């Protein structure tokens, strides 16, 4: 379906048995003055909790949401791709139910940037990792380092996901790749790589932030943690055999191993220094009130 010229952005929300996550997204957005966006919610849940939440929210907000109950369920990746196939906006943003906008004017800020820079194909947003039990947060990756990494070879994303979750990746709808259903661990980064190989015409919007909830025991990441090593091994073999990548991040020659070891040390030092910096200067003080506002509806529901 061709993008509707009147719609600038499609916010795509796949959900599965987690109405609280959808609640956090919807009640964290100010949609009163947003006229250039559509919101699509595609639901794989076997129960009607999400549908009830949508009905209640639309009565209060007067904002129309396109809601689809998948019968039968499509599975996570099938649901994501179905949302992308249904998007009508010029740009699309896929926001999972454990991700959320930090500020209520998130959509209007993003639309303003898209209108100001209409020639861009990709907008990268900043990502904040949020730990709801403690109320603390840390940057996914410091902005300066992220800016530098965005200039590196796209295949480095297979080594380190410096973009973050799909909610931090806004892409022109007609160019947005589809997620590879044969992947689990590398499914996000593989899509980013495919898009960056098509176009490096991107802009990093460090002032527009999304939160990523950490520590959920029923997340996809948690469900595969016990077999992660085997999954990564199989997927690397698949990527080598089907995508044709052959660089230092996949090879097993001595030089590649040395480079990966040095990179591992650098990355570890960067992670430690980021945490120390966050503690010393209280990085959370900037978005802390906004993050509390974002997670507060969950605590009160």
Give the positions of each predicted feature:
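Short, well-formed alpha-helical segments that are part of the catalytic scaffolds
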Residues: 18-31
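Short beta-strand/loop segment that forms part of the nucleotide-sugar
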Residues: 36-45, 68-70
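A conserved acidic beta->alpha catalytic loop
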Residues: 43-52, 100
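Glycine-rich, basic loop-to-helix element that forms the pyrophosphate-binding segment
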Residues: 70-87
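Short aromatic/hydrophobic "clamp" motif used to bind/position activated sugar donors
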Residues: 92
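Conserved donor NDP-sugar-binding/catalytic core segment of glycosyltransferases
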Residues: 105-138
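Conserved nucleotide-sugar donor-binding catalytic segment
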Residues: 125, 145-225
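Catalytic core of nucleotide-sugar-dependent glycosyltransferases
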Residues: 208-216, 220-249
């Amino acid at each position: 379906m061709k993008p509707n010229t009147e719609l600038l952005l499609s916010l795509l929300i796949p959900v599965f048995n987690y109405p609280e996550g959808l609640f956090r997204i919807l009640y964290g957005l100010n949609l009163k003055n947003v006229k250039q966006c559509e919101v699509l919610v595609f639901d794989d849940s076997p129960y009607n909790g999400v549908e009830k939440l949508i009905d209640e929210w639309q009565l209060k907000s007067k904002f129309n949401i396109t809601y689809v109950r998948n019968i039968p369920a499509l599975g996570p990746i099938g649901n994501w791709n179905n949302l992308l196939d249904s998007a009508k906006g010029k740009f699309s943003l896929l926001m999972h139910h454990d991700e959320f906008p930090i500020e209520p004017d998130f959509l209007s800020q993003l639309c303003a940037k898209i209108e100001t820079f209409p020639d861009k194909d990709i907008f990268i947003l900043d990502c904040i990792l949020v730990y709801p039990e403690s109320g603390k947060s840390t940057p996914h990756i410091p902005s300066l380092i992220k800016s530098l990494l965005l200039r590196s070879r796209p295949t480095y994303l297979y080594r380190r996901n410096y973009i973050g979750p799909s909610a931090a990746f806004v892409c022109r709808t007609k160019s947005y790749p589809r997620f590879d259903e044969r992947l689990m661990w590398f499914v996000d980064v593989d899509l980013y790589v495919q898009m960056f190989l098509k176009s490096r015409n991107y802009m990093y919007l460090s002032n527009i932030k999304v939160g990523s909830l950490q520590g959920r025991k029923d997340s996809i990441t948690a469900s595969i943690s016990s077999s992660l090593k085997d999954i990564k091994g199989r997927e690397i073999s698949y990527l080598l055999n089907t995508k044709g990548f052959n660089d230092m991040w996949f090879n097993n020659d001595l030089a590649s191993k040395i480079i990966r070891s040095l990179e591992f040390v650098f990355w570890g030092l960067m992670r430690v220094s980021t945490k120390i910096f966050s503690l010393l200067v209280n990085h959370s003080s900037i978005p802390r009130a906004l993050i509390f506002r974002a997670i507060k509806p969950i605590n009160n529901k």
